[in-house]
């Protein structure tokens, strides 16, 4: 990041120029200069705007927030777009694999969940990871009940099955503050 807008503007122009040397160009809808960081909230309030802008990068949304002590900090969470895509992909995967044995399904599902947690398991993203796990469990319940003409599980039996085939809980793998 840059402390002053003129520095950011100079870098932005230099980047455009450098990329044009190689026949590349910046997508203007995906690149912009935003006020971000320690004073972003104060500056936006002075202009009569509500919250500081956010930006998405590699499936994560970066936003300005405050610590428990009230100090400004930058936080990260799964972007809404990627969250919806991943939930939909998980739903499709569950429906495609509903005919395999429950033990095998749960083993593969555990591996998929851990992979998701490892990529998105960053400081301050625990809530989105928990939401993903919960949505996965809801779809798993629906999928397992569509395996035959009669209902396979009620919610009590399903939670009993989940106690036997434990699904991993979300874990923060990368701390931004170490």
Language-model segment annotations:
Residues 1-178:
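Non-catalytic terminal/accessory segments
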């Amino acid at each position: 990041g840059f402390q002053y807008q003129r520095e950011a503007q100079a870098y932005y122009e230099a980047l455009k120029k450098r990329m044009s040397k190689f026949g590349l160009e910046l997508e203007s809808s995906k690149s912009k200069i935003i006020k971000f960081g320690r004073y972003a909230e104060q500056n936006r309030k002075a202009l009569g705007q509500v919250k500081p802008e956010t930006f998405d990068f590699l499936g994560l949304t970066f936003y300005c927030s405050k610590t428990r002590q009230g100090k400004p900090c930058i936080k990260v969470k799964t972007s809404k777009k990627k969250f919806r895509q991943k939930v939909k992909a998980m739903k499709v995967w569950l429906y495609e694999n509903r005919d395999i044995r429950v033990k095998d399904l749960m083993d593969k599902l555990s591996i998929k969940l851990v992979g998701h947690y490892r990529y998105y398991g960053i400081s301050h993203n625990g809530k989105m990871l928990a939401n993903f796990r919960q949505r996965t469990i809801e779809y798993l319940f629906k999928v397992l009940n569509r395996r035959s003409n009669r209902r396979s599980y009620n919610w009590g039996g399903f939670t009993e099955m989940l106690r036997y085939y434990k699904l991993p809980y979300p874990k923060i793998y990368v701390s931004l503050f170490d």
